[in-house]
C-alpha cells in the first residue's frame, strides 16, 4: 500500500502484479566490473571492447513496461553520442518463467528496434550482481578510467516523454565528456525487479 500510495502521488500507479524496485545507488567511484557476454549474434563482448571516454551500462529486458517506456529515448541517446560514448545493454533475467527475455527474443528486438549498441545476455546473472543492478532499467555511467560517475534515472518522466524537463543521463554524459563534475542530485532509477533464479 505504501508503494502504491507513493506512486499515485508521483502521478502514476503500478500494476499490483509488478514489483517496483528502486536502484541501490552503488557508490560513486566504484570501478566497472569486467565481463564477457554473448551479444544477439552469439559473439562475446567484453568490457575491454569499449574505448570511448564515457561508457553507459544499462541493465534492461524486453518485457518490463518501464524498460519499454524509455527504450526509444535510449536509442536516441545512443545515436546522438556515437563516436563519443559507448552504450551496452545487458539482460540478466531468468528466462524459464520470462521467455520474452530469451536470447532469441532479444535478437528480434535488437533488429526490429535497430539498436545502435550491443545487447548482451547475462545468463548466470553474475554480471548484474557484480554491478549491483536490481531493476530494469538500471543505469550506470563510467568515465574514461571506468569509475562510476552517475547511477540514476534516464530523465524526470519515464512515462511521458513529451513532458520530460530534465534529461539527467544526457546531462551526466555531457559533464563526463567535458571533464566536469556532475553537479546535480542523482535520483535512483526505478523499474521492474530483475528476475533472479
Where do the language-model regions lie?
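Chalcogenol-based redox active-site neighborhoods
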Residues: 16-186, 193-197
Amino acid at each position: 500500500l505504501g508503494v502504491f500510495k507513493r506512486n499515485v502521488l508521483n502521478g502514476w500507479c503500478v500494476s499490483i502484479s509488478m514489483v517496483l524496485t528502486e536502484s541501490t545507488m552503488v557508490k560513486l567511484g566504484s570501478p566497472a566490473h569486467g565481463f564477457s557476454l554473448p551479444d544477439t549474434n552469439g559473439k562475446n563482448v567484453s568490457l575491454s571492447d569499449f574505448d570511448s571516454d564515457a561508457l553507459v551500462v544499462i541493465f534492461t529486458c524486453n518485457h518490463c513496461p518501464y524498460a519499454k517506456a524509455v527504450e526509444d529515448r535510449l536509442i536516441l541517446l545512443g545515436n546522438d553520442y556515437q563516436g563519443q560514448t559507448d552504450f551496452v545493454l545487458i539482460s540478466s533475467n531468468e528466462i524459464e518463467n520470462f521467455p520474452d527475455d530469451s536470447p532469441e527474443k532479444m535478437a528480434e528486438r535488437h533488429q526490429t528496434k535497430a539498436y545502435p549498441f550491443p545487447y548482451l545476455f547475462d545468463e548466470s546473472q553474475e554480471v548484474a550482481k557484480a554491478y549491483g543492478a536490481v531493476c530494469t532499467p538500471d543505469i550506470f555511467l563510467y568515465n574514461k578510467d571506468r569509475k562510476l560517475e552517475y547511477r540514476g534515472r534516464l530523465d524526470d518522466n519515464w512515462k511521458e516523454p513529451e513532458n520530460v524537463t530534465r534529461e539527467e543521463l544526457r546531462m551526466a554524459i555531457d559533464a563526463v565528456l567535458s571533464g566536469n563534475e556532475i553537479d546535480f542530485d542523482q535520483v535512483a532509477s526505478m523499474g521492474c525487479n530483475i528476475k533472479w533464479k
